[in-house]
């Protein structure tokens, strides 16, 4: 009888050791997976914050660019309607035929192509300035963290 008790006790001890090892193995896995989950959650939260920051930055500079374009279009419409004038440093050649007097020369004016180029340049300058400002802010707020 004592031999059967010894065998049963040995089997029970082996089962307890095996179960202890299995529980410890699954516990270690659970701890590892929890750490990975926490790290992934932290990374996702950081990415979402960065996405919100970039979206806010994009919205702000897109609005500035749209405002600049609206200002240029308003200026173009005002100049076309005669409400505003472009100043140009120019001279008008005097007419050599006939008597000279006040108002003989025409007022200096840009050609249609030059006026169009002026608006394109203004628009390009505003667009590039807005893009540079956006990229500088993006680098400061996102890349240098």
Swiss-Prot record:
Pfam families annotated for this entry?
Phage_lysis
Membrane side Cytoplasmic: residue ranges = 1-3
For whether the record's keyword set contains Ligase, the answer is no
Q: Indicate the transmembrane segments per the record.
A: 4-24
Q: Superkingdom of this entry's organism?
A: Viruses
Give me the Periplasmic side stretches, as residue ranges. 25-145
Q: Which GO terms describe its cellular component?
A: host cell plasma membrane; membrane
Subcellular location, record wording: Host cell inner membrane
- Which keywords does this Swiss-Prot/TrEMBL entry list? Cytolysis, Disulfide bond, Host cell inner membrane, Host cell lysis by virus, Host cell membrane, Host membrane, Membrane, Signal-anchor, Transmembrane, Transmembrane helix, Viral release from host cell
Q: Which InterPro entries match?
A: I-spanin
Q: What is the recorded membrane topology of this protein?
A: Single-pass type II membrane protein
Any one Gene Ontology BP term: viral release from host cell by cytolysis
Q: Which family does it belong to?
A: Belongs to the Lambdavirus i-spanin family.
Q: How does it assemble?
A: Homodimer; disulfide-linked. Interacts (via C-terminus) with the spanin outer lipoprotein subunit (via C-terminus). Part of the spanin complex which spans the entire periplasmic space. The spanin complex is composed of one homodimer of the i-spanin linked by intermolecular disulfide bonds involving two Cys residues and one homodimer of the o-spanin covalently linked by an intermolecular disulfide bond involving one Cys.
Summarizing the function annotation, the protein's role is: Component of the spanin complex that disrupts the host outer membrane and participates in cell lysis during virus exit. The spanin complex conducts the final step in host lysis by disrupting the outer membrane after holin and endolysin action have permeabilized the inner membrane and degraded the host peptidoglycans. Host outer membrane disruption is due to local fusion between the inner and outer membrane performed by the spanin complex.
Could you tell me what this protein is called?
Answer: Spanin, inner membrane subunit
Task: Please name the source species.
Answer: Salmonella phage P22
- Which gene is the coding source of this polypeptide chain? 15
